[in-house]
Amino acid sequence: ATGELYKPEDLNVINFNDVGTAMLQDAVWVTDSWISQDGNDAIAEKFLRATFRGWMFCRDNLDACVQHVLNAGPTLGESHMRWQLNEVNALIWPSPNGIGVMDQGLYDQTVNVAIEGGVLTAAPDAGAVRTDLAAAALEGIDGDTTGAGFSKISVELNPGGE
């Protein structure tokens, strides 16, 4: 009925990781012309380090992180923000190689799925992807960059996300 939340038994969830069609999606993109300019490697590294620290903070301080978002005046309420952060955290953590370090096997799978699906006609050139900046950003971080002990919490999603 209208206004009722869906329950897990109402859904058929397909985990694309289980069927070999998962694709990497979230990334930081820059143009080759920008990153090749003097000093921009350092800017990118600092940006990644700050981003990683932010996600580590949100992993370890869910309530405070949700409150930061609520203070910014989102259109959705607290339970939605809490649920969303819990789900995003589960996508990031654990990160066995460290947050932001791309898994080469998953990258290769992403390329293969994109080629098979007609999104790409050929694999990107070897220089299209860089992982050295994420690795350098991790070197400057104190704290748990792998989140090995992370586990999702139970979040009650209220009608309308309130």
Q: Predicted regions span which residues?
A:
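Secondary-structure end/capping motifs
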Residues: 36-121
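A bilobed periplasmic-binding-protein/Venus flytrap-type ligand-binding module shared by bacterial periplasmic
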Residues: 24-42
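A structural motif
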Residues: 16-26
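Intrinsically disordered, low-complexity coil segments
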Residues: 8, 36-41, 126, 146
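Helix N-cap / beta->alpha transition motif
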Residues: 15, 31, 103, 129-135
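Conserved C-terminal helix/tail region of periplasmic/extracytoplasmic solute-binding proteins
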Residues: 108-162
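Ligand-binding "clamshell"
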Residues: 1-16
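Glycine-rich, flexible loop/turn motifs
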Residues: 24, 30-31, 95-98, 125
